Structure formats: structure tokens, C-alpha cells
From Swiss-Prot:
Its EC number is 2.5.1.78. This is 6,7-dimethyl-8-ribityllumazine synthase. 5-amino-6-(D-ribitylamino)uracil binds at residues 26, 60-62, 84-86, 117. The gene is ribH. Belongs to the DMRL synthase family. It comes from Leptothrix cholodnii (strain ATCC 51168 / LMG 8142 / SP-6) (Leptothrix discophora (strain SP-6)). It comes from the Bacteria. The active site is at residue 92. Keywords: Riboflavin biosynthesis, Transferase. Pfam families: DMRL_synthase (PF00885). Pathway: Cofactor biosynthesis; riboflavin biosynthesis; riboflavin from 2-hydroxy-3-oxobutyl phosphate and 5-amino-6-(D-ribitylamino)uracil: step 1/2.
Length: 154
């Protein structure tokens, strides 16, 4: 999603879209910033606040299950995954990063719903803060673009 605003359609229109966000609470201050910038961008793109569903889960490994439940409802044009995984001293970082990313992709493919994945995987807290605003906005833009594309392709 790096530079998601480059090479996209000149105007992204989210005015007719319903979007759901699943936010992991682990590293809460960072994921709150991701959510704040994501929601602000969705609204700037025309998504009505009443059409944005925002739920939280304990951590990155729980994001996919909530996404799956939302996808099964078939009430949303796009979903967004928000989280922050910071490398520690053990193998746990790789496990959580790999499994959460694969699970998000699996839900998207199995349900045919676009999911913008903004679960940050970073080496340290400074890297997370440096990305929180931009990646939240990028996730919103990706969700709107892909929802519109899926509508065009159907």
C-alpha cells in the first residue's frame, strides 16, 4: 500500500459505499491513530459516517475472524484491517505478522470482498508512529478504490 495515492484514479468516490474497519487494540495509541486517519480519509472521500462500522479486537491475530464475520454479513463494500505489530526479542513477531497477513488475504479471497490491510509490521515504535497517519489514509483510499473496482467488474 505504499504510496497508494500514486497511479490511482484521479477521483475516488466513496459516497455510495459501506465500509467496516477492524482495529486491533494491542499497541492502542498507534492503532487509534491509524483508525483516526483512516476514518477521516474515508469521510473526505465521501463515505458517510453512518456507513462506517468500526469494531475493535484484542490483537492482530483476532482481526481476521472479525473480518470474516463482517464479510459473511455481506453488508459492506470493503473492509479495512488496522493493527500494529512491533518486533520483540522472540519469534512471536514473525508468527503474528505472517499469520495475520495470510488470514486477512484468505478472508478477502474466500468472500470476494476487498480488504485494505494496514496492519503495520515494524521494527520499533518510532517506525510505527512514522507510518500511522499515512497508512491509515492509504487504507481508506485502497478500500474505496477496490470497492469501486469490484462494483465495475461485477
Amino acid at each position: 500500500m505504499k504510496n497508494a495515492d500514486r497511479g490511482v484514479a484521479a477521483e475516488l468516490d466513496g459516497s455510495d459505499l459501506r465500509v467496516a474497519i477492524v482495529q486491533a487494540r494491542f499497541n492502542a495509541a498507534i492503532t487509534e491513530q491509524l483508525a483516526s486517519s483512516c476514518i477521516a480519509e474515508l469521510e473526505a472521500l465521501g463515505v458517510l459516517a453512518k456507513h462506517i462500522k468500526h469494531v475493535t479486537v484484542p490483537g492482530a491475530l483476532e482481526v481476521a475472524l472479525a473480518l470474516q464475520a463482517l464479510a459473511e454479513q455481506k453488508d459492506h463494500d470493503a473492509l479495512i484491517a488496522l493493527g500494529c505489530i512491533i518486533r520483540g526479542e522472540t519469534y512471536h513477531f514473525e508468527l503474528v505478522a505472517n499469520e495475520s497477513g495470510a488470514a486477512v488475504t484468505r478472508v478477502s479471497l474466500e468472500h470476494g470482498v476487498p480488504i485494505a490491510n494496514a496492519i503495520l509490521t515494524v521494527e520499533n515504535e518510532a517506525q510505527a508512529w512514522a507510518r500511522a497517519d499515512e497508512k491509515g489514509r492509504d487504507a481508506a483510499r485502497v478500500a474505496v478504490e477496490m470497492a469501486n473496482l469490484m462494483e465495475d467488474l461485477s
